[in-house]
Amino acid sequence: MCGIFAYMNYRVPKTRKEIFETLIRGLQRLEYRGYDSAGVAIDGNNHEVKERHIHLVKKKGKVKALDEELYKQDSMDLKVEFETHFGIAHTRWATHGVPNVVNSHPQRSDKDNEFVVIHNGIITNYKDLRKFLESKGYEFESETDTETIAKLIKYVFDNRETEDITFSTLVERVIQQLEGAFALVFKSIHYPGEAVATRRGSPLLIGVRSKYKLSTEQIPVLYRTCTIENVKNICKTRLKRLDSSTCLHAVGDKAVEFFFASDASAIIEHTNRVIFLEDDDIAAVADGKLSIHRVKRSASDDPSRAIQTLQMELQQIMKGNFSAFMQKEIFEQPESVFNTMRGRVNFETNTVLLGGLKDHLKEIRRCRRLIVIGCGTSYHAAVATRQVLEELTELPVMVELASDFLDRNTPVFRDDVCFFISQSGETADTLLALRYCKDRGALTVGITNTVGSSISRETDCGVHINAGPEIGVASTKAYTSQFISLVMFGLMMSEDRISLQTRRQEIIRGLRSLPELIKEVLSLDEKIHDLALELYTQRSLLVMGRGYNYATCLEGALKIKEITYMHSEGILAGELKHGPLALVDKQMPVIMVIMKDPCFAKCQNALQQVTARQGRPIILCSKDDTESSKFAYKTIELPHTVDCLQGILSVIPLQLLSFHLAVLRGYDVDFPRNLAKSVTVE
């Protein structure tokens, strides 16, 4: 995930070297988010405030390489002191364009660096904006979506209706043209000593530090009275006059520092006093005064933004509070699941809209069959949702491993709709299966976590799961987001089915409560760690279930294989008597997933067979399930949700168990041997 860090010192004298060090330290605190290049933008050699130019330094690779590059800049005097200065810094995780210096951030508006911007997120309509700007004579040098933002603000500035237009007004007009998710921080030679930041769908917070009293603890949110529909329209209205009652500043126009970051870990060493921006907030700092405004007012808007105190210690923030990316990603699932649904599920009207599919919805509804194709964890997400897709779409659903699908030369027809699931969007077998289906005239749908990937480009339409970059090789949050994306597709397909409305409403209510239920499951981490202490010396492990939880068993067993190097097998409980029962004895650890769903009675039969062979089952069950717990060696009790979503809650204990087993066995959780995050060869 891209990392944003920016630093403004107002009436706080700092040398260029000190500013560099602050920016680099901020980026180092964001390294755990993952990145492939880094860059900074600072004021040029002339220290007169009104005559500055912007100097960019960017480097592919680690922040350390950028740090070394900064000190090679012969044209910059590191001893020059700035009383007021604004510097921005960025770590980039490539989404549009390969990792290189040109594609790195900050991105610039032109060769004179009139405007520079750093960006975390994805602009989905950047191609249309780029085409428009190119038609106006603006030349692009990178492949990024972010450069479109830099060029767009230059276009708005060049076509301004008045010379006294404010920096925040320019940004306001720009973001009204943007679609997608973003956190943005802008710097400009036309507005020296000023900063503007905004966000929509990506996190951004502002830290404030001053040894003087601050003007307020609650920053009022200001509004304009008009809305600009496109970049050519002119808004005649103005914001309320900025004064001590509408801005945050040090009383008496004294010294103050502001820190902008996508993560609190980059700020905490400087201050624990922060303001969390909300979606569509525009925060501007000018003359040491911070103001926040929004374009549109809604009834649910909070009228102010409070300064909050971070409850965090510096030593906690390496890789956030986590020892490994995988652990971090497991604990991010309340947020990643919410992000997958955000803007797509309307819980008030019980409607679902997947914007990437809406133009093809009629064609999809006319199809005769759905084919869902993936590898590894992505395949398991397809298995997990097959039953609910069949129920909601009333269509036959085939779930295929991409390699096997190709080996069989599976018949595919023009009235099929084929889904291709891949976290990276580059999985070789899945990509080959996509091309195979396209050649046969099927409609193709991509479900990926990477905008601009091969699968997202080559499919006819698709769903971006919005889970955020997943760095750990063993997939966790991508699985649950893929799961939810497929469920949302089924809900969208069944919207006009009167007979399914009660079921749809039940599932949508379940989706709404999922983030909180996931937090409840994550609170079992200590209990699962204690279980891992008993199991980590074992050589083999069986995971059994059926119905909606069969995929949970497959995925849980895969996680254990991937990072603990223990043999583990996910078994359909209905197949127990057809071979696997021979493995059961008092030494073999057996995990059983038994939930209060239509398969409950059949799972009880399997449980009896295991205990009859002196097996000691570890049971994942519902909180109110006293029947299963009677026969359990140990139980992990989970909150109950609608049956087709229970697999999201039941897989998380297995993710946590695999993590703790790997740590106890002394293995690198994030980089298991012989495995890569993105499998780009057959």
UniProtKB/Swiss-Prot annotation:
The active site is at 2 (for gatase activity). One of its GO terms (molecular function) is carbohydrate derivative binding. GO terms for biological process: cellular response to leukemia inhibitory factor; fructose 6-phosphate metabolic process; protein N-linked glycosylation; UDP-N-acetylglucosamine biosynthetic process; UDP-N-acetylglucosamine metabolic process. Pathway: Nucleotide-sugar biosynthesis; UDP-N-acetyl-alpha-D-glucosamine biosynthesis; alpha-D-glucosamine 6-phosphate from D-fructose 6-phosphate: step 1/1. Substrate binds at residues 377-378, 422-424, 427, 578. SUPFAM superfamilies: N-terminal nucleophile aminohydrolases (Ntn hydrolases) (SSF56235), SIS domain (SSF53697). Keywords: Aminotransferase, Glutamine amidotransferase, Phosphoprotein, Repeat, Transferase. Its EC number is 2.6.1.16. InterPro entries: GATase_2_dom, GFAT, GFAT_N, GlmS/AgaS_SIS, GlmS/FrlB_SIS, Ntn_hydrolases_N, SIS_dom, SIS_dom_sf. It catalyses: D-fructose 6-phosphate + L-glutamine = D-glucosamine 6-phosphate + L-glutamate. It is an enzyme of class 2 (transferase). It comes from the Eukaryota. The modification Phosphoserine is found at residue 244. Residues 360-499, 531-672 form the SIS domain. Residues 2-288 form the Glutamine amidotransferase type-2 domain. Transmembrane segments: none annotated. Controls the flux of glucose into the hexosamine pathway. Most likely involved in regulating the availability of precursors for N- and O-linked glycosylation of proteins. PANTHER family: GLUCOSAMINE--FRUCTOSE-6-PHOSPHATE AMINOTRANSFERASE, ISOMERIZING, GLUTAMINE--FRUCTOSE-6-PHOSPHATE AMINOTRANSFERASE [ISOMERIZING] 2. This is Glutamine--fructose-6-phosphate aminotransferase [isomerizing] 2. It comes from Rattus norvegicus. The lineage of its organism: Eukaryota, Metazoa, Chordata, Craniata, Vertebrata.
